[in-house]
């Protein structure tokens, strides 16, 4: 798939190993040794591939659900972390969808007082000390406000507590933080929220398929060993939330694996030469590989999903905003929703 400079690929393959010690590089189709610690195995051309097909129940459409929300229909968003690349990408996607962008954002102490220009809009950044007063004022001025959070992992919990205190609905795209505390905070606040470790709709669909498989076939991979590699831009400090979600499914399928075994690749040189990340996307990509091997080494499975750019996440975030606005207007239950809920709603732009 290619759109707006974005390339995304999600694949699920069952295949026989081409060679027990080598696998193909996705870019060069040259064989790469698998014995080193940072081994990766992005498949180029594998002859014996069998698609795994899983089905889900019929999704409810916006027409069936009623209370549909057209893009830009009175919705206003405040993007916290607007100076970052994801924040800017969301603003551009929301602006294209006709959603009103509030000219206010939260940032670090160093960013306080700065103005960020995105899509011809000047957005004033406020520091931590004045957040509650500013957010309350913005929410009063824009009663259909939805906050979008793309800040930093260390700010996740404090930000969620603030949103709950003010009562403003939000979409949390920031990963990291104390997730147990995050969910507890939002549940106790009884507000509308979409929280997901992954905002890319197609990747979320893959995650949903993994969930279905783990629920329907628990223990199917008992005894298998698992290797997980994920490569992101160097600015991403934490391990991939998506990788953790997929690993959780494998654990339900009977695989023993600790999250600290995830191979994080952040070195640009290795990303280009070994992983196969296009050089122009080193500063913004998300490559994931999961390799399963049977106890006797005669069977192997590989699952991979690779994304270059940020458009897929920005577009998914806007869909989450529209979904949340619909829930608010229909007076649906105030609770935490996720991107699978957004997908099941059935309105993909």
From Swiss-Prot:
* Amino-acid positions noted as binding NAD(+) in the UniProt annotation, renumbered to this chain: 81-86, 173-175, 196-199
Show the GO cellular component annotation of the record.
Answer: chloroplast
> Where primarily located?
plastid
Q: In which pathway does it act?
A: Amino-acid biosynthesis; L-lysine biosynthesis via DAP pathway; (S)-tetrahydrodipicolinate from L-aspartate: step 4/4
Q: Entry's InterPro entries? A: DapB_C, DapB_N, DHDPR_bac, Dihydrodipicolinate_Rdtase_pln, NAD(P)-bd_dom_sf
* UniProt catalytic activity: (S)-2,3,4,5-tetrahydrodipicolinate + NAD(+) + H2O = (2S,4S)-4-hydroxy-2,3,4,5-tetrahydrodipicolinate + NADH + H(+); (S)-2,3,4,5-tetrahydrodipicolinate + NADP(+) + H2O = (2S,4S)-4-hydroxy-2,3,4,5-tetrahydrodipicolinate + NADPH + H(+)
Output this protein's name: 4-hydroxy-tetrahydrodipicolinate reductase 2, chloroplastic
